[in-house]
Regions:
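Cleavable N-terminal export/targeting peptides
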Residues: 1-44, 177-179
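Short glycine/proline- and aromatic-enriched beta-strand/turn motifs that initiate or cap beta-hairpins
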Residues: 30-78, 87-88
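N-terminal short leaders/motifs
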Residues: 31-42, 94-106, 119-124
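Hydrophobic, lipid-facing positions within transmembrane beta-strands of outer-membrane proteins
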Residues: 48, 68-72, 82, 96-100, ...
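Repeated loop/turn-to-beta-strand initiation elements of outer-membrane beta-barrel proteins
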Residues: 48, 80-84, 110-112, 142-151, ...
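Residues on the lipid-exposed face of transmembrane beta-strands in outer-membrane beta-barrel proteins
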Residues: 52, 72-76, 86, 100-106, ...
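Outer-membrane beta-barrel "beta-signal"
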Residues: 54-56, 162-179
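Solvent-exposed loop/turn segments connecting transmembrane beta-strands
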Residues: 59-67, 88-99, 108, 122-133, ...
Length: 179
């Protein structure tokens, strides 16, 4: 178990360093057209998205975790770089979880927004006895005219958090017509 935590700590540290480096390169070379990164201009928006939960691929395949994390959720995009989200899903431990959070994604590579979702979750029996806990997860988002997708990377933390890559498809159900 300690090896798993150390390994994930190293991956998280490397990811943080790489992200920091890319942020500096985005600012340094914003005018360079060969740089694939761009800073998203913060502008007001009003979009409501619904989702059916997530499909996950767990890193520990031998543990028989639930990969079909289906449920229902809402995401309200109030800005080009930020949105709020809340919902409920059947989690990896085969129990129900609730969540609420905020996405902040100020960077893009082409149509993909890059950032994090920060919020709270509950319903995991081995984490805080099923109570609420805070989490910050790297998140990628693609949004088309009516459909979109969020991808999350969840680190393994001992027996409390089950590492996975999760895909959440979403459907836009409301956006006022622009004048």
């Amino acid at each position: 178990m300690r090896v798993c935590i150390r390994k994930n700590y190293k991956v998280a540290l490397f990811s943080a360093i790489a992200l920091s480096s890319s942020l500096f390169s985005v600012n340094s070379f914003a005018e360079d057209s060969s740089n694939p990164f761009s800073i998203i201009q913060s502008e007001p928006k009003s979009q409501l998205w619904i989702n059916p939960g997530m499909a996950s691929y767990h890193f520990q395949q031998d543990k028989n975790f639930n990969n079909g994390n289906w449920g229902a959720g809402l995401e309200y995009r109030f800005n080009t770089v930020a949105s709020v989200t809340a919902g409920r899903f059947y989690n990896s431990d085969r129990a129900y979880s609730n969540y609420a959070g905020v996405y902040y994604q100020p960077i893009a590579i082409g149509p993909i927004k890059i950032g994090a979702v920060i919020g709270g979750f509950n319903g995991y029996p081995t984490t805080n006895n099923g109570g609420w806990f805070a989490a910050a997860l790297p998140a990628l988002t693609w949004e088309g005219d009516w459909v979109g997708a969020n991808v999350f990377v969840i680190p393994t933390i001992g027996d409390r958090v089950h590492g996975a890559i999760s895909l959440q498809l979403k459907l836009k159900v409301f956006e006022p017509k622009s004048e």
